[in-house]
Amino acid sequence: MKERLEKLVKFMDENSIDRVFIAKPVNVYYFSGTSPLGGGYIIVDGDEATLYVPELEYEMAKEESKLPVVKFKKFDEIYEILKNTETLGIEGTLSYSMVENFKEKSNVKEFKKIDDVIKDLRIIKTKEEIEIIEKACEIADKAVMAAIEEITEGKREREVAAKVEYLMKMNGAEKPAFDTIIASGHRSALPHGVASDKRIERGDLVVIDLGALYNHYNSDITRTIVVGSPNEKQREIYEIVLEAQKRAVEAAKPGMTAKELDSIAREIIKEYGYGDYFIHSLGHGVGLEIHEWPRISQYDETVLKEGMVITIEPGIYIPKLGGVRIEDTVLITENGAKRLTKTERELL
């Protein structure tokens, strides 16, 4: 964490930023090692960083934080600390009202966004971060296999989701990384078809998309199955998505752009005549947030680098018929890509 702070301070020097105010919880955790439930804020002044927390969070923050911790009773104390700051570095997510309050109550003259330097830091994972994500992926692998076993004719989607979310917690997850998607039948054509009260029927395609939050880091995996035997159309679109996903994983490597990686899977799906049914980007970064940089899309020119963790998740979604998505969390390595989620992909 010392190295992270040093890079932030260097950015401040290069951009004539006097102080930095960090409020987004995942960024507070990234720089301090703690994420107070009741709120916490980091102020960087010169090369010194301090974590400010409400009184009720003080004892826990003191135990966990790698930064000095100071408690406050009223936010006015924060305004006072930042009084007469010429240039304040802030995150783009900071609310308009808080910016206005800093102008009025702290007399801040100018604001500069610090999102780019934080993105550049967080986009490359350390060895320790990768090990945590690998554990989160291990939990997700166990959960997706349990979901496959749980899915039977007549069972409600929510029943399956509840059981796998319980299993993830029993295996060490803090909670699901996001609302578990169990989307069956016509609902499998909904990319974000979170589990509903719909009963699963024989012949349904079922998209299972889940992830585990473990020690603050996320995992993400999707598998698609059929209840019973697949028909010709279901098998066709499954094989196309599987080919696109495998080819993209095999091709991913440092030096290529996110756009180039997206196009590998997208062109395969287009060649089979289903380009209009692949309606989202190929993937996204995974880390402290379930969706973070880079965006693996047809518009993103980000160059892939060793240490990035991304998802590769092509899909085909045909309204009224159903959909197929196959997704893995993948680590970009020196020589290519390594699947961190390892559940069998050939499930039809």
From Swiss-Prot:
Coiled-coil positions: none
Outcome following mutation: residue 284 to A/L: 2000-fold reduction in activity
Intracellular or extracellular location(s): Cytoplasm
Reactions it catalyzes: Xaa-L-Pro dipeptide + H2O = an L-alpha-amino acid + L-proline
pH dependence: Optimum pH is 7.0.
Enzyme class: hydrolase
Record keywords, A-Z: Cobalt, Cytoplasm, Dipeptidase, Hydrolase, Metal-binding, Metalloprotease, Protease
GO cellular component labels: cytoplasm
Superkingdom of the source species: Archaea
Effect of residue 209 to A: 1300-fold reduction in activity
UniProt-listed Enzyme Commission number(s): 3.4.13.9
Binding positions (Co(2+) 1): 220, 284, 313, 327
Family matches, as InterPro entries: Creatin/AminoP/Spt16_N, Creatinase/aminopeptidase-like, Creatinase_N, Pept_M24, Pept_M24_MAP, Peptidase_M24B, Peptidase_M24B_aminopep-P_CS, Prolidase_arc
Chief site of localization: cytoplasm
Ligand binding (Co(2+) 2): 209, 220, 327
Gene Ontology BP terms: proteolysis
Family: Belongs to the peptidase M24B family. Archaeal-type prolidase subfamily.
Subunit structure of this chain's protein: Homodimer.
Protein name per the record: Xaa-Pro dipeptidase
Highest classification ranks of the organism: Archaea, Methanobacteriati, Methanobacteriota, Thermococci, Thermococcales
Originating gene: pepQ
